[in-house]
């Protein structure tokens, strides 16, 4: 939980020379996507339209990850996590409530991948510092990385796609999704406590609060806080999300360039994620034009009202757990009528809250597993899969139910 070398810690992101299986998947998708265009399986005009659509999304993804990485390097997450433990005054239930709120807020504001990649190591280290069970804090991060990702367009890439399709600004989008988000959070909180925190609490029900983490560079720490607030203010003011994240990242990059330029490396940019997303869009669009759309349209059906919303959300959740939530969203979105907002938002719930039953259903879950393995943490697998499947079903149904009540 401490910085090293007298300055901010170096952002944790694997270099290209250390290839990870996800690197190979990203490159394979990019090559496959380029091959689809080169061979004519995907017409160039369609590919150009797709790339034009996702360019603002790629700008957001690239800059928000840089913002999150440098925010972590400045010690913001470490400081906040230890302060949560201090504020809880040794109370296990109080720590639970504060950790749930912290993970949910991180997901809502800085997106689910930030929670999975950057908050997970902090929570794991906090558990070691407190000498408590690691599993409750680990599961809190991955569950809320997924189920807290409904409220704002920036919380999840699928949200950005949906908001762009229906033409909603962030506040209007939040006006639709705030009740479904509350429902998903309520179910998550109850299941987290019952299956994980209640069972693994300390024998005395209390723990010894740690000392507050001191950032290595207070100036960079304050700069990171200002950059995050600037990002949130830009979103609330209605600025394009890519521009808001780029401006905030630029401010923090300037701070690091002036004080610790050695921290800035090309590996800060999430090359793997950008390549993965670009290739995935092209490949899914190609498969859709060659038969997938017909199958997905049959699964999603044409029903309206509650049956249609439940079927769209269920199809999204099913396909997400079979493959992954991003291609699942793209495949179902392609067969929904342009003006069918209710089923689109139900699909969004299914592909955001539903991808928990299996580890590969969400990129955030894969990234979380990677961080847990790097820290030598093994979450009880059978218990995790069973409880995650329960959350996927109950959380999705609760969120879609509230959507139907308010739309």
Per-range role (PLM):
Residues 27, 58-59, 93-101, 115, ...:
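Hydrophobic alpha-helical transmembrane segments
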Residues 68-69, 102-111, 144-151, 180-188, ...:
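Helix-loop-helix module between adjacent transmembrane segments
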Residues 1-71, 179-181, 189-288, 387-407:
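Hydrophobic transmembrane alpha-helices of multi-pass small-molecule transporters
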Residues 32, 82-92, 108-110, 209-220, ...:
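Short, amphipathic, aromatic/basic-enriched membrane-interface segments that mark the entry/exit
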Residues 130-199, 203-212, 344-347, 368-398:
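Membrane-core helix-loop-helix motifs of multi-pass transport proteins
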Residues 80-81, 114-125, 138, 152-166, ...:
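Re-entrant/interfacial helical elements at transmembrane boundaries that shape
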Residues 241, 306-309, 339-345, 358, ...:
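Hydrophobic multi-pass inner-membrane translocation pores used for secretion
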Residues 44, 48-132, 271-341:
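Membrane-embedded alpha-helical segments and adjacent helix-loop junctions characteristic
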